[in-house]
Amino acid sequence: MLTLDKFEEASEIVKKATQETKLIYSKYFSEQTGNKVYLKPENMQTTGAYKVRGAYYKISTLSEEERQKGLITASAGNHAQGVAYAAKEFGAKAVIVMPTTTPLIKVNRTKGYGAEVVLYGDVYDEACAYALELAEKEGYTFIHPFDDPAVATGQGTIAMEIIKELPLVDYILVPIGGGGLATGVSTLAKMLNPNIRVIGVEPAGAACMKASLQAGEVVTLPNVNTIADGTAVKTPGKNVFPYLQKNLDDIITIEDDDLIVAFLDMVENHKMIVENSGLLTVAALKYLHVKDKKVVSILSGGNMDVITMSSVVQLGLIQRDRIFTVSVLLPDKAGELVRVATVIANEQGNVIKLDHNQFVSTNRNAAVELKITLEAFGTDHKERIVNALKEHGYNPKVIRPNL
């Protein structure tokens, strides 16, 4: 059972393994939304995510005998690092089962804390089932990533810090995967101030908690599909579910495209790397239809591998019309490429890629295709460049960039 005494105890214990992440006021998001927006940067924890709070507190509640049997868990990455780090602090062996789709950065960092990593299954649920098998077979103590009151209590220490620093907070936005973080945060927030509204945020492609709350019972999704790998969960926690039924005020679901935009917003306006699951609460700000409120978005983690980061940046630039491609047909004669380039240069467009296809027509002397990938300042600038090409006699077609 989650109690105020346990939350207070956990707040003191987790200080040994975590740092108190101070709220960051966001001028950018405040102006965008008409609220006072603060960010809770759990991506700044030593392990890169909030998960170490729940892992450390849970392990602290175990007996020495339970710890010495060895610890095992399943995780898409951040809980893995939390358990590995906490186990090392307690001098215990840790075995971590991770889905085969887990980003390499999370796998390597988990190993770096001294844990044994086993890759199994495509999603968390499959990895978890295998971890439970190993626990039974080898006698390990299983540390559940979210469906455990002690783990949820540790995660809830985030709410203690938020309310201590911002006593008059109106809204707290919290990411939801299996529900451990949302359980701890919403339960403690309501204990300390029932007027605080706690909004859960899920990826639209893995909205297991929303489906469960609507059904009035825990349900399992047939599949999940989201770039927010840390919250790609089919089945929410059965033990924590009643707390969320009682304490969660609403749920917002977020499409992947919104996460891509949020990543660019964080990089460009806060110079901060936040992983896709951590960006859920940033993307949700525009769907929170309130004004003049104090809002805290919990950034749950920042463990993103460079390849994923590169892909998200590219997609974000394309989505915002800062990179686009046009196809034009040109007569196959000298000087045509210079003419097109001059039109673009006069509009301050920056060419970053050219693809010249002489075989678009059976008569290559009649026309060749030129695909031009450009960098622009945004939608208005893109339209200006396209219109300039039209005015100079070209018939530009905007096509999907192939970078």
Label for each model-derived stretch:
Residues 1-403:
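PLP-dependent amino-acid enzyme catalytic core
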